[in-house]
From Swiss-Prot:
SUPFAM superfamilies: NAD(P)-binding Rossmann-fold domains. Belongs to the ornithine cyclodeaminase/mu-crystallin family. This is Delta(1)-pyrroline-2-carboxylate reductase. It holds the Pfam family OCD_Mu_crystall. GO terms for cellular component: cytoplasm. GO terms for molecular function: oxidoreductase activity. Catalyzes the reduction of Delta(1)-pyrroline-2-carboxylate (Pyr2C) to L-proline, using preferentially NADPH over NADH as the electron donor. Is likely involved in a degradation pathway that converts trans-3-hydroxy-L-proline (t3LHyp) to L-proline. Its EC number is 1.5.1.49. Keywords: NAD, NADP, Oxidoreductase. It is an enzyme of class 1 (oxidoreductase). It catalyses: L-proline + NAD(+) = 1-pyrroline-2-carboxylate + NADH + H(+); L-proline + NADP(+) = 1-pyrroline-2-carboxylate + NADPH + H(+). InterPro entries: NAD(P)-bd_dom_sf, ODC_Mu_crystall, ODC_N.
């Protein structure tokens, strides 16, 4: 069995390739060619933290695996990662353990790739300004993926802890050579954006102003009914609301559950799963005036396909630590 660390994965990753594999996984899922149950969500430590159990089988892609991650928001106060985890791949023919991959980096990359796929199909082609609300680890992968599919010229950042936004601004400028500006008001931050990303642990909406025509939103932070990043009017006012899995999104996120409970939005108003847009079954963006929202909660089959991609690259490159059970 091969053990692949975060650093080893980092050296193997090509974001354009990861985006392509994420799209393939989404397409297989929406065509009902995978077994991807609703993930198990286990609260612990007086419900402050969450463990997520995510298995998947993709028959056509010969992939079988399991991801287990923990989300501990308070870890950031002690300088530790808020997401820790592991992904196990099994041999599709024999069922033997094939690989163990560090899970927090993989999660960051696949979260980014999902937003990359959504941005490719739903953002305006001439989108130039990206606004990111929440500048934690997940924002790194999303920024890289959005840059891969759109020619972004300006980045606007907002974070509750301003110092972290400034640190992220420096990261963007040094790694990607793009100007990045910190705003102290979230409503001001979104006002000039073509693409908005929300990646926070918020339980109440992170902005209140109405969305401008033509904007695209990737909302990736809320993965529990008690979490809500988007104001209800952002969902209700969107021309197209898109998800990875209708079942998972309706089961897991306050971003959809709250407006539904308020009687403002109906489950059947979800435009499509992203895989249906990739396959051409449903339309993506159709004009420059549309407001589009991609509400992401994560999907195990994407993790497993990205893990398989990383495993194959590791074998090809002679990377990783081989161990005997």
């Amino acid at each position: 069995m091969l053990v692949i660390s975060a650093n080893e994965q980092r050296n193997l990753v090509n974001m354009n390739e990861v985006i392509a594999y994420a799209a393939l996984a989404l397409k297989e899922f929406s065509a009902e060619r995978t077994i991807t149950p609703i993930r198990g969500s286990l609260p612990f430590a007086n419900e402050k933290n969450t463990a997520l159990i995510m298995p998947s089988v993709a028959e056509g892609l010969e992939a079988l695996g399991l991801k287990v991650v923990t989300v501990v928001p308070e870890n950031k106060k002690i300088g530790k990662k808020t997401i820790n985890g592991i992904v196990m791949l099994s041999d599709f023919q024999t069922g033997e353990p094939l690989a163990l991959l560090e899970g927090s980096y993989l999660t960051m990359i696949r979260t980014g790739a999902l937003s990359g796929v959504a941005t490719k199909h739903l953002a305006r082609h001439n989108a130039k300004t990206l606004c990111i609300i929440g500048t934690g680890e997940q924002a790194k992968g999303i920024a890289e993926a959005v840059f891969a599919v759109r020619d972004i010229e300006k980045v606007i950042l907002y974070n509750r802890t301003e110092e972290k936004a400034y640190a992220f601004s420096q990261y963007i400028q040094e790694k990607f050579g793009k100007p990045a500006y910190v705003h102290t008001n979230a409503n001001e931050a979104i006002s000039e954006a073509d693409i908005i990303v929300t990646t926070t642990n918020a339980s109440t909406p992170v902005f209140s102003e109405k969305l401008q025509k033509g904007v695209h939103v990737n909302a990736v932070g809320s993965f529990k009914p008690s979490m809500q990043e988007l104001p209800s009017h952002a969902i209700v006012g969107a021309n197209k609301v898109v998800v990875e899995s209708k079942e998972a999104a309706l089961d897991e996120t306050g971003d959809l559950q709250v407006p539904i409970k308020e009687g403002l939005f109906k489950a059947n108003a979800i435009h499509a799963e992203l895989g249906q847009i990739i396959s051409g079954e449903k339309a993506g963006r159709e004009n420059d005036e549309e407001i589009t929202v991609f509400k992401s909660v994560g999907l195990a089959v994407v993790d497993i396909i990205v893990a398989k991609y990383l495993y194959e690259k590791a074998v090809e490159s002679g990377v990783g630590n081989k161990i005997e059970f």
